[in-house]
Amino acid sequence: MARKALIVKQQKPQKYKTREYNRCKICGRPRAYLRKFGMCRLCFRKYAHQGMIPGVKKASW
């Protein structure tokens, strides 16, 4: 889990646009962020397995 201080710090408007970065909306993780879903890969995998993300299913070929 991300530290609360870092999450709050990131939410404040930055002086320069390049300092902004994406965080997972669920756990606050800054790495492995999936833009299309707005969450990190770990939360994506968890919710996809539970069937909570519409249109996502496990690949099989």
From Swiss-Prot:
Originating organism: Caldanaerobacter subterraneus subsp. tengcongensis (strain DSM 15242 / JCM 11007 / NBRC 100824 / MB4)
A GO term for molecular function: zinc ion binding
Obligatory cofactor(s): Zn(2+)
Alphabetical keyword list: Metal-binding, Ribonucleoprotein, Ribosomal protein, RNA-binding, rRNA-binding, Zinc
Binding site for Zn(2+): 24, 27, 40, 43
Note accompanying the cofactor annotation: Binds 1 zinc ion per subunit.
Subunit structure: Part of the 30S ribosomal subunit. Contacts proteins S3 and S10.
A UniProt-annotated Pfam family: Ribosomal_S14
PANTHER family associated with the record: 30S RIBOSOMAL PROTEIN S14, SMALL RIBOSOMAL SUBUNIT PROTEIN US14M
Family (UniProt): Belongs to the universal ribosomal protein uS14 family. Zinc-binding uS14 subfamily.
Keyword Zinc: yes
Function: Binds 16S rRNA, required for the assembly of 30S particles and may also be responsible for determining the conformation of the 16S rRNA at the A site.
GO biological process, one term: translation
Lineage top rank: taxon: Bacteria
NCBIfam families reported in the protein's UniProt record: PRK08061.1 (NF005974)
GO CC terms: cytoplasm; small ribosomal subunit
This protein's encoding gene: rpsZ
InterPro entries (UniProt xref): Ribosomal_uS14, Ribosomal_uS14_bact, Ribosomal_uS14_CS, Ribosomal_uS14_sf
Record-given protein name: Small ribosomal subunit protein uS14
